[in-house]
């Protein structure tokens, strides 16, 4: 048997990346395909239908474009014979979901529904189902639902049930016309194989499914809304299978489009951050993996089910079979830095960066690195896109304390970096206080590769060593590992994800170690962060929510005047 390869495809927020990997984890070729429609958050494509605040949609055709462009490109770049590619795996942002008809066609592609916002793909960061999430949590708490503590006491507006309920409330016809609500990752697998299978990772973390208990009861769904009583056996029906399972094989049509052979094994879908865990070679407890990009997802393995405040979920076999997989997260990290560079930086900074031939981020990072902890006089709460863990509240907003007339852009930049590190520390503390150990940190994604200052701050704030993934495409490599498992040993792949990760997972030799004097100062700053966190985040002062409410009321009044 000659040398064999697998392909992993990582569907992110703005683009899809395909990576061709050999069975030792060496990346042979990769290609990024930007989504032609990007994130749809203002106006629906091909129409003037305006979207409300907090909406975030996508176009499902963009996902197929990734298969049609990125996969043939990596084959061409590498010169690898398609016959030597034994499997394909994908991972996806989640919960990114869409309604489809009985043939599996997205409703937004049907002319009669094109101008209806609820027919489109709802991206993970669609936050317009907050009212539904609030009511769901209230009803679940009143009923004493057993599932609630597994999700840190709150179900997020980003997840499947809240999004489905929003569709039912705001466009019941779209709900009625929907045969299935699918995670986008499961829909792409359906397009490749012709088989509808739901992966246990997304079902467990985003759809309130439990390996032992299944979905919540019909009585619970009836308590939410009588029309939802039969949701799980109708519009959420379909087999739920473990990660690494073979979903099927490439159809003739998709094989031709992708430049691969019909019959190539396809692994069930996965969630982007979770695929990164084996991608860095982590297959045992005590090692927290941070998938760092626009947001951060924190993942950890444990040997028993513990309840942790504000965690996104604990799912048996949710990340690595045989362990309980814990997930927590921050709703915005890279997005905050990008917002500041785009919206908050004065013209002289942009001009200076251009003159030096560096990006604005690099210019700011270089100058911010000259400051000691505490020297900026600033402290921020990292809630620009709400708070995922531990407060689970998308109505919270950002805050910076300590501005003066002498405050510089690089000081603000550093304060924002530090704020996101404090947010991660808050999550680590929650795990440790509830008996889930965190001994060391692993970081992957775009940010750790680009920003050394950020990683040193994280090491200092958490007082833990951080190892960095060798790959820039860790989730895609993780997806490729699951492809090797789906292909099976008999075809040159692996028997289990543990075996695949031990052979294919890689980290850099360079690590970030805490600097003792920085740790001491950051401990003091963290205590102040905690006071602000609890004051604004736990109900003592709801000014952020009032401001957001007044903003939305004023905006709605202005729009109604424009329409009249």
From Swiss-Prot:
It is an enzyme of class 2 (transferase). Transmembrane segments: none annotated. Pfam families: FGGY_C, FGGY_N. GO terms for cellular component: cytoplasm. InterPro entries: ATPase_NBD, Carb_kinase_FGGY, FGGY_C, FGGY_N, Ribulokinase. Keywords: Arabinose catabolism, ATP-binding, Carbohydrate metabolism, Kinase, Nucleotide-binding, Transferase. It catalyses: D-ribulose + ATP = D-ribulose 5-phosphate + ADP + H(+); L-ribulose + ATP = L-ribulose 5-phosphate + ADP + H(+). One of its GO terms (biological process) is L-arabinose catabolic process to xylulose 5-phosphate. The keyword Transmembrane does not apply. Gene3D superfamilies: 3.30.420.40. GO terms for molecular function: ATP binding; D-ribulokinase activity; ribulokinase activity. The keyword Disulfide bond does not apply. Its EC number is 2.7.1.16. Pathway: Carbohydrate degradation; L-arabinose degradation via L-ribulose; D-xylulose 5-phosphate from L-arabinose (bacterial route): step 2/3. Belongs to the ribulokinase family. This is Ribulokinase. It comes from Geobacillus kaustophilus (strain HTA426).
